[in-house]
Amino acid sequence: MTELPDSTRWQLWIVAFGFFMQSLDTTIVNTALPSMALSLGESPLHMHMVVVSYVLTVAVMLPASGWLADKVGVRNIFFTAIVLFTLGSLFCAWSSTLNELVLARVLQGVGGAMMVPVGRLTVMKIVPREQYMAAMTFVTLPGQVGPLLGPALGGILVEYASWHWIFLINIPVGIVGAIATLMLMPNYTMQTRRFDLSGFLLLAVGMAVLTMALDGSKGTGLSPLSLGALVLCGILAIALYLKHAKNNPRALFSLALFRTHTFSLGLSGSFAGRVGSGMLPFMTPVFLQIGLGFSPFHAGLMMIPMVLGSMGMKRIVVQVVNRFGYRRVLVATTLGLSLVSLLFMSVAMLGWYYALPFVLFLQGMVNSTRFSSMNTLTLKDLPDELASSGNSLLSMIMQLSMSIGVTIAGLLLGMFGQQHIAADSGASHTVFMYTWLCMALIIALPALIFARVPNDTHKNAVISRRKRSTQ
């Protein structure tokens, strides 16, 4: 890194700030949801669309971001991503209704979807191959710090200012980043194949419509007949994509990916696994504030042990998988995460608040081990010519499954809860207890998929390399 030219180091700093902005925004919002609900006149149990709108937009836009960067240029797309993200943040802060906030989060998600993959592509183009790993480690470190700072920073801003400031802090950073991008970043372009617009639109419609339908009649305000039509529309769109992609070399995601058995198992397990674990970052701060009466600041602080456990486990996950094999690790961590989530609820209901940080630290460790194992299992056996496409599909599935997880969490809260519940009341405890039981079951179910993973026949020599490609 030290022998790189000054201009290249500045370009890496720009990419690193983009990673930081995007990752910070994934966790800073969760702590503020109850305060947002109070300000907007909504029930805290119905605020999940603030999270879903952002994550789902990222999932939908991810497949197009790399192609746009190659076609239009990395500087132009990265600048556009920062501008859209910053404008989305401004509109979020100006929002006076939940619908306005959701629309602003969609705009923010479009920028966020382009920021990280285009940033990775930028590093690939400006750094020599032998220094690529060191450069990626440098630019992704702020992305790991963002989730750590997000909950606590969100809690501080909500408690001592207002929820609007969790979005307003993005604006000066975004302005500086946009100016620096125009001044310092070269506009690399590449020859690209024709973009599969038909496949992109079919997948986008299918993902968005099915996620909306999951929100139910209470969330969408639609009749059961209209919801049924949405489901049919989503299924039809996915079916049409499968027909479109069959024997199509220009398809957005080739169906040849699924000829690799471990990819099929890993992708289905990753989808099901992240539906369950995607509920936890949303549910935990909401439960701490609405269920236990914690302040936003203290709820944010309680999330830090979970992130610390996750970051700490990344250092030894390679050895764990090589020692015990994928099947044992994935089945054990899936069932373990379900048990730890039940332990968290039990400790909270018993009033042993001093033990909650330890439980959350353990939850972070188990979750991190499972995530890394799922990622590498999915990609490790793909042929080189399909590795990039497989990685893109996995990234999209990761975002989609998390949005579905948050949607299901909101659906469960709405099903068990009333329109408005008082903080730290018996009614709220009952609502969260039933929701947590359902969530623990959903978290455990992917163990049935991972039990089908074949026994490892050799030590995994590529887990470390593949794991970094999915960070």
Swiss-Prot record:
Membrane topology, from the record: Multi-pass membrane protein
Pfam families: MFS_1
Transmembrane segments: 12-32, 49-69, 77-97, 102-124, 138-158, 165-185, 197-217, 222-242, 263-283, 286-306, 342-362, 396-416, 431-451
Cell location: Cell inner membrane
PROSITE patterns named in the record: MFS (PS50850)
Molecular function (Gene Ontology), one example: transmembrane transporter activity
Main location: membrane
Gene3D superfamilies: MFS general substrate transporter like domains (1.20.1250.20), Multidrug resistance protein D (1.20.1720.10)
Name by which UniProt lists this protein: Putative multidrug resistance protein MdtD
Species per Swiss-Prot/TrEMBL record: Citrobacter koseri (strain ATCC BAA-895 / CDC 4225-83 / SGSC4696)
